[in-house]
Regions:
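Conserved HGGG/HGGXW glycine-rich cap/lid loop of the alpha/beta-hydrolase fold
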Residues: 69-119
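Conserved serine/cysteine hydrolase catalytic core
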Residues: 225-318
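Catalytic active-site module of serine/aspartate enzymes centered on a nucleophile-bearing elbow/loop
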Residues: 310-352
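Conserved hydrolase catalytic core segment
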Residues: 146-189
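Active-site loop/oxyanion-hole signature of alpha/beta-hydrolase fold enzymes
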Residues: 74-76, 114-152, 168
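Alpha/beta-hydrolase fold catalytic core
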Residues: 2-81, 105-107, 126, 224, ...
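Alpha/beta-hydrolase
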Residues: 85-86, 112-114, 178, 276, ...
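Flexible "cap/lid" loop of the alpha/beta hydrolase fold
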Residues: 176-208
Length: 352
């Protein structure tokens, strides 16, 4: 009798178990369907709003074809040498909005959007500094912007302009490095800082994954900046191609700096000024801690000093009151420094 009861109880539990499993299956299928629906809605929202933004805010410069792709170039002013502005990682010509109009008062000045950034088409080539220099050379040539040039590079743009000068030395007569990255910085940073660097890489990858579905756009995580250019920043920095390019640029720089792939030589006696951020303003996030931030600032300062020795006429200036974006925090200093180098480069150009 007890055996019969046990068998009957087990038989009764099996249908209940199947019903529970069936309802769990329905629930999971419903959740999967909801996720798919949200993804479709998000992707549609991203596509429509991206198109609307680009129609509303057109680029101020010209779209020049380079190797079958359109690259945005914005030139103003007259005179020689022409100042070429190279932006930092993921940045576009708008990072120079406070300095370009003033520079145009004493010479010709051009900013541009690298491939996949701003209003420029994305390109299949990896964003190595050598490829970026090659694209810039083609852009300037196709647009009829003749050398000589004074190259100005911010952050990772500092490495790009050094590589450009190394590839096309006769084109360049002066250089300004604005809180420039250093080719060896990943190896020279304090080792505990690399944990934060890896977290930043993860952040860029999450943004890249979320952007095609409109998440950063919807929650307001893209296109933040000074109010006078915020709408234009939102137009370009909420684009899917921007998130993909930013991630690719960071990955490439991390690998190149870690492996020592980006090697360039001396600038000889070329006019050179290195502008560095104010250590008291902090170029590193609070999240890494006070002690590590101090160690990182010391390492950064040493690397900035190294950059100033690239030329026998090199000079380093610490931008008081400025963080990493010196051209935003201290546009006056950036303008005066570029003016100084332009004047010095005119004499240098005659001698070379």
């Amino acid at each position: 009798m007890p055996l019969e009861t046990a068998e009957r109880g087990g038989a009764e539990r099996r249908p209940r178990r199947r019903r529970v499993l069936r309802w769990i299956g329905y629930l999971l299928a419903g959740l999967a369907g909801l996720v798919v629906l949200l993804a479709i809605v998000g992707a549609t929202y991203q596509s429509v709003e991206s198109s609307n933004d680009l129609r509303t805010h057109s680029p101020p410069g010209r779209l020049i074809e380079v190797n079958g792709y359109k690259i945005h170039l914005y030139c103003v002013g007259d005179g020689s040498p022409t100042v070429i502005l190279e932006s930092g990682l993921g940045d576009n010509w708008l990072s120079w909005y406070k300095v370009q109009p003033a520079l145009a008062k004493f010479t010709r000045v051009c900013s541009y959007d690298r491939a996949g950034v701003g209003w420029s088409d994305a390109q299949p080539e990896p964003p190595h500094s050598q490829n970026i220099a090659l694209h810039l050379h083609g852009l300037l040539n196709n647009a009829g912007v003749k050398p000589p040039y004074v190259l100005v590079g911010h952050s990772i743009g500092g490495i790009h302009v050094r590589v450009y000068q190394n590839m096309y030395p006769s084109d360049v007569v002066g250089m300004v490095l604005v809180d420039s990255s250093h080719p060896d910085q990943m190896k020279r940073y304090p080792s505990p800082l690399m944990k934060w660097v890896r977290l930043q890489r993860l952040e860029f990858k999450l943004v890249k994954l979320a952007t095609p579905f409109g998440v950063p756009r919807f929650v307001g995580l893209c296109g933040d900046g000074p109010v006078e250019i915020r709408d234009m920043l939102r137009t370009v920095e909420c684009q899917t191609r921007w998130a993909e390019t930013q991630d690719a640029e960071y990955d490439d720089f991390y690998s190149a700096a870690s492996e020592g792939r980006t090697t360039v030589g001396s600038l000889g006696s070329m006019p050179l000024v290195v502008l560095s951020h104010d250590p008291d303003k902090g170029g590193f996030p609070d999240i890494i801690g006070v002690d590590l931030a101090k160690q990182s600032e010391i390492a950064w300062g040493e690397m900035q000093e190294d950059l100033s020795h690239l030329s026998t006429r090199g000079n380093r200036v610490v931008a008081k009151g400025a963080g990493h974006g010196i051209q935003i925090d201290r546009p006056d200093l950036v303008i005066d420094t570029i003016h100084l180098v332009v004047d010095a480069s005119r004499a240098y150009s005659v001698l070379h």
